[in-house]
Amino acid sequence: MIVVTSDHGMPFPRIKGQIYEEGFHVPFIVYWKGKVMGGRSVDDFIGFHDIAPTLLEAAQIDGNFGMTGKSFINLLTSKKSGRIDKKRDHMILIKERHDVGRANEDGVNLGYPVRAIRTDEYLYVVNYKPERWPVGNPEYDYRNCDNSPTKSYLTGLKPGDKDYRYNEMAFAKRPGEEFYLIKEDPHCMKNQALNPEYRKVMDKLRKRMENELKRTGDPRMYGKGDIFDKYPYMGKALDYSKKIK
């Protein structure tokens, strides 16, 4: 079996590390001689947590030891295209302390907690700490965005410049809720969260998302989300006493 995929979207502002379509929707191609029929495109939602159970089943190894993912061998070996498993009609997305670039008064690195649900038509996002900067603080040069000519161009813009809105979309603080019509707006450029036309849809998606998060024991659903900011940071910590700008 040969699997071709990617771990995240492009290393550009508002993509890598961000919960927008191009940040988490990655390619996934499988070749398995004699098992997978070519020329098919499957619409079922799968996540990286589903890959290990799938590979174990393909190798005929019992993987029933606490994995959260579910094998999608049935999708690979099916001869159908489109939606195969009706239960795989959405994906839950979670972000916590993925990045660096923001800290509390003690210099402890803080995360940017997000939960989201993606369906065929919609992406609904909840930003639990909208008072924080989503890709790191300005004084630390937005450290959760990789350095690149694109980042340099955007951070060099000033209010009133022609492209300044792209700076705001990439680096500015975000609202508590975001809602995108994926088919019409695949790049997630127009937040519809304040559009009353979609309030009922958003409420329905939030309830579905939170029910699933409660079922899986997400601490943030039980008022214990701040625990994620208290774990020791094991990587190379940023010296928050040195402001970049």
Language model feature labels by segment:
Residues 20-21, 100-193, 243-245:
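C-terminal, low-complexity/hydrophilic appendages and adjacent surface loops
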Residues 1-14, 59:
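Metal-dependent active-site segment of extracytoplasmic phospho-/sulfohydrolases and closely related
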Residues 14-66, 70-86:
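Substrate-binding rim/cap in mid-to-C-terminal beta-strand-loop elements of soluble/periplasmic
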